[in-house]
Regions:
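Signature for HUH/AEP ssDNA processing cores
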Residues: 1-124, 132-147
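Short Gly/Ser/Thr- and Asp/Glu-enriched loop/turn motifs at secondary-structure junctions
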Residues: 119-125, 168-173
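Aromatic- and Lys/Arg-enriched surface recognition patch
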Residues: 140-178
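Conserved small/polar residues in nucleotide/adenosyl-binding loops
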Residues: 184-187
Length: 187
């Protein structure tokens, strides 16, 4: 396994210039142990019952990454280096416990083989960073789209889960949330 790297952006979401680059290993350490991220995640999750307040807090407080690679600016045409990963976002699960169960089950999936799996900012969802092969005879966009749609179809067929299709854009922001029990595949 290779170590994927991606752009890291400080909050708020209106900040489109990355503050740096991080690896999946660095994200593992940050998501599982950073006390400031833990406090921000708790503040965001305090408003999960009020969708407008939750969305506003998530967008103003939480940092985010672009799992598909390194970008000079958070826009698809500004990709500098692809990571070989894409994000799968499963939302609207019934409970935090169900989210943790799916995090663990999907991380163990032998077809998906995620590099990273954590409970999403809303606590009732899961985010997976899934590796894919870049095809030398295809464009980057085609390789990315093909892998993403294949994974979505597989998730629905194998697990009965619908992924959030808003993540079809390579530069799509993936908000980070504290998860002491996230799962990580070391290279």
């Amino acid at each position: 396994m290779k170590e994927s790297i991606m752009s890291f952006f400080n909050a708020p979401i209106t900040n489109k210039v990355p503050s740096g680059v991080c690896s999946v290993a660095g994200l593992h350490a940050y998501i599982s142990s950073d006390s400031h991220l833990k406090e921000l995640t708790q503040r965001v999750r305090a408003d999960t019952e009020n969708d407008k307040a939750f969305r506003g807090k998530k967008q103003t407080l939480l940092p985010y990454v672009t799992p598909a690679g390194i970008f000079s600016y958070c826009r698809e045409q500004c990709i500098m280096l692809p990571s070989g990963d894409f994000v799968i976002d499963i939302d609207h699960l019934a409970s935090v416990e169900e989210a943790m169960m799916w995090r663990d089950r999907l991380f163990a999936d032998e077809v998906l083989q995620p590099d990273l799996a954590f409970v999403s900012p809303g606590a009732k969802g899961v985010k997976l960073f899934v590796p894919y092969r870049l095809n030398l005879t295809d464009t980057l966009e085609h390789s990315f789209d093909n892998a993403l749609h294949t994974a979505w179809d597989y998730l629905e067929w194998r697990h009965g889960l619908k992924a959030d299709t808003a993540n079809a854009d390579m530069s799509r922001a993936c908000f980070l949330a504290y998860d002491a029990c996230l799962l990580y595949t070391s290279p």
